[in-house]
Amino acid sequence: LSGLVGTAIHYSGAFLSYPAVTFMDALMARFVLNGLTGLLVGFLVLGGIIVGFNLTVILNGWAILNALGMMFALALGIGVLNCYLFTRFPLWQRAWAILMRPMFILSGIFFIPENVPSRYIDAFMINPLPHLTSEMRRGVYATYDAVHVNSLYVYGIALGCMMLGMILLLRNHKELAEL
């Protein structure tokens, strides 16, 4: 989602030529459309598994909502910052794609953070993605206790990236539209 938001100005160049359309319109349209699409797909997959296999589950709705909130906030924050960086420095988009490959492995999808050795856990949890996956696990698995989740940390990173990206975009959006 952050990658799609990051390319909003590039792909909305024709719309940005209209005086009534701003870069914020392009960012928010891209975020809302792709965010709701991803949410619907996730709901259908999870719901389909539960109904298809006739599972009895105890879902923690607050933990799921918190995980989704962290995910959307982080995607928007990093997406807004990358929107500036991708447009201003085209090479950054390729570098970002290369850097994010190992981040997928280190996001806590294939293993749980509680199994990481104690001497590495602090370094591992610098990455905000394990916080998301652990919080979602807490919402789906009733017996899972997400000890290392720090929601404020994730929301803080998201807000910081969003603020920095907005400052850069507000200062340079006319220049970026010409690139």
Model-derived segments and spans:
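Transmembrane helix boundary and interhelical loop/hinge segments in multi-pass membrane proteins
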Residues: 1-23, 28-34
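Alpha-helical transmembrane segments and their short interhelical loops
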Residues: 23, 28-96, 146-155, 159-166
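Helix-loop junctions at the membrane-solvent interface of multi-pass transporters
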Residues: 51-52, 110, 114, 171
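Pore- or pathway-lining transmembrane helices of multi-pass membrane proteins that form conduits
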Residues: 90-109
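Short hydrophobic, aromatic-rich alpha-helical segments embedded in or entering the lipid bilayer
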Residues: 105, 109-144
